[in-house]
Amino acid sequence: MIWNESIECMDRESLRKIQSIRHKKTVERVYHDTPFYRKKMQELGVTPDDINSIDDIVKLPFTTKYDLRDNYPFGLCAVPMSQIVRIHASSGTTGKPTVVGYTRKDLSAWSECLSRAFTAYGAGSSDIFQVSYGFRHPDVQRQYGEADYTDA
């Protein structure tokens, strides 16, 4: 079953081209709008000009849970807080809470991604899901796919 034919049936070369374009835009955004990522990239001697395809992902630094905690609460945001429409946070049981902010575009992307996943494993609009979860942010993200999933 196919959710988004234009993406899911795209030839490999076209898909990699889209991935490369979006990857480069993301790197440019975080480099220019997030001091944390700019510093991490500069420490590695990497600039957005060094990122030309999805294959260049190996040039970029990792982001760890400690990075998220050390920049608590919003030090890694690449957009103004006025664009954040939803915030998810861990309980902080093992340290500072891990906070992630989402824009409307982020939530739409999650919905699209999860709708594709539900469709790929055969779910249809007449199926019933039970998703039992804690309130960790990855679990809450699944709600967006479930809420927007209407038909296969």
Where are these regions (language model features)?
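Conserved AMP-binding loop of ANL adenylate-forming enzymes
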Residues: 115-151
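Nucleotide 5′-phosphate-binding alpha/beta core
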Residues: 1-89, 94-112, 116-120, 124-126
